Amino acid sequence: YAEFKGKVKRFNYSLGIGGTRSWMSAQGNGYQDYTLRPTISLKYNLTDKSSIKYTANLYSSSPSLSDLENVEQIVDSMQIRRGNSQLKPYMVYAHSLNYEMSKGIFNGGVYVGHRYSDNPIMESTTLENGKFVRSMENQKSWQRLNTEVSISVKPFKDLLTMQFSGGMAHFDSRGLNYHHTYTNWYYNGTINATYKDWSLYGNIKKGRNNFYGETMSRNENFHVIGMNYRHKSLTLGMMTLNPFTKTWKGGDDNYNALAPSKERIYIGNLSKMMVFSVSYNFNFGRKFSSVEKRLNNEDKDSGVLDAGK
């Protein structure tokens, strides 16, 4: 991976290029793929208090070892999970535009992002001998358009901070024999009041759901109220999780035409839960700054086929 950075007056730019080689062979089937990974970042400072930034990158995504294995697993009396040794890597194109500004007690931003996958690996369901066979295939396309607005206010310097962000995510999932669109609105709000060694905070969130293939996965909704007391390196905390709901809910929805399904998770213990915390910061020795790796060549694939519904 190589990267070149530069600055011309109010204009900052960064250009990067990398390469990946993907190779897999299983039971006489497999693939070999070479892909360039270019990235670009352009930032223009409109004023000392506002800027606009554009980023773009493309990369290749490879099938997992478990999905490539030509094996079958029985999910239940009506469903079979099957691997697919014919899966191929696919390209992902991502770009975003971000505007940020600050004026007085206000800070805000607007974000627009788009991600497109060409021939992505997504789920497929067929009917064979009275059983539903679920596997993965290279489908037509998948894309997500995400817009988000954020604002923060500090009316009394650091004594009170209020933050809110909200947005919309639109998904378009095109398979070989299905087409789904899904739009989700989400938000996240926090408030933090601090006085001397005491702090009081609250957080409420409606999560951004995800849609991929034919499955909509629900992100969690929650709210929290808490208090902290800090004395030197010691911090004592207390918070209550979801105090105004009876049950935490989660789950997935599958919109397949042959075998649609809904999965729900209900956890009563995650509502009106009290949490107490104690922490102590041990600060000794030398401090070193760290740099994040841009490229991570690590294999974490167990090769086990997921037998979930």
PLM regions with names:
Residues 8-11, 45-49, 92, 102-106, ...:
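Outer-membrane beta-barrel channels and translocator barrels
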Residues 15-21, 42, 54-58, 99, ...:
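Transmembrane beta-barrel strands of outer-membrane/channel proteins
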Residues 1-27, 33-41, 159-163, 168, ...:
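Surface-exposed extracellular loop regions of Gram-negative outer-membrane beta-barrel proteins
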Residues 231-309:
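C-terminal beta-signal and adjacent terminal beta-strands/loops
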Residues 2-6, 40-44, 97-101, 147-153, ...:
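Residues on the lipid-exposed face of transmembrane beta-strands in outer-membrane beta-barrel proteins
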Residues 48, 60-109, 116, 134-146, ...:
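Outer-membrane beta-barrel signature, preferentially recognizing the C-terminal barrel domain
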Residues 88, 103, 107-168, 174-188:
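Outer membrane beta-barrel strand-and-loop segments of large Gram-negative receptors
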Residues 25-34, 65-73, 78-80, 112, ...:
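Outer-membrane beta-barrel translocator domains and adjoining extracellular loop/strand segments
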